[in-house]
């Protein structure tokens, strides 16, 4: 098992929190929701990967790598987008999930769609053609340990609700 990477400098994270990535304020807690990719926010993406690995290891899982980022997060053409909740007071990422619109998924010459779901299930041609373009694949959702109710009730009270606001 690899040692988890160091936290990304908060100043670097804040520099990437630009208005074009801002979605909205949360309904509870006055936190902020953003959407980024590895291309427009490499530091935030790295911190998300670090926090996911910490969170999943804490729950008995994890990749065992230094940072939980894979080919879907880092794709050069159409990476998954990262929706996350930012706590502006503590300057921390609370949690989030990655997603991709089904219509942006590319079909290989052999008909295979490259997505985490296709690694778990056989996607029929009918599903790929008629339904997939109207879907959004969500995955790797997490609430980092410092915002889970079992660790900090005050912080954790609305953490998951804040993510669902997105």
Predicted segments with their positions:
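Conserved N-terminal entry element of GNAT/NAT acetyltransferase domains
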Residues: 2-39
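Generic detection of long, well-ordered alpha-helical segments
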Residues: 3, 7, 38-49, 157-161
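Intrinsically disordered, low-complexity boundary segments flanking structured domains
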Residues: 16-23, 69, 121-129
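Short amphipathic alpha-helix that is part of the acyltransferase structural core
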Residues: 25-71, 82-98
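A short helix-loop-beta-strand connector motif used in the catalytic cores of GNAT acetyltransferases and
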Residues: 73-84, 107
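Short, well-ordered loop/turn elements at secondary-structure boundaries
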Residues: 78-81, 89, 93-94, 131-133, ...
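Acetyl-CoA-dependent GNAT
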Residues: 99-103
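Acyl-donor binding region in acyl/amide transferases
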Residues: 104-166
């Amino acid at each position: 098992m690899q040692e988890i990477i160091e936290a990304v400098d908060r100043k670097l994270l804040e520099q990437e929190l630009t208005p074009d990535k801002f979605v909205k304020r949360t309904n509870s807690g006055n936190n902020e929701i953003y959407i980024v990719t590895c291309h427009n926010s490499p530091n935030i993406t790295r911190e998300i990967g670090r926090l996911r690995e910490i969170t999943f290891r804490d729950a008995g899982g994890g990749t065992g790598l230094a940072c939980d980022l894979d080919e879907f997060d880092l794709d050069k053409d159409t990476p998954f987008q990262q929706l996350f909740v930012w706590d502006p007071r503590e300057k921390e990422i609370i949690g989030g999930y990655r997603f991709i619109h089904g219509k942006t998924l590319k079909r290989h010459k052999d008909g295979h769609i490259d997505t985490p779901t296709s690694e778990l299930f056989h996607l029929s041609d009918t599903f790929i053609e008629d339904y997939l373009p109207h879907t959004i694949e969500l995955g790797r959702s997490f609430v980092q340990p410092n915002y889970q109710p079992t660790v900090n009730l005050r912080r954790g009270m609305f953490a998951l609700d804040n993510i669902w606001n997105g």
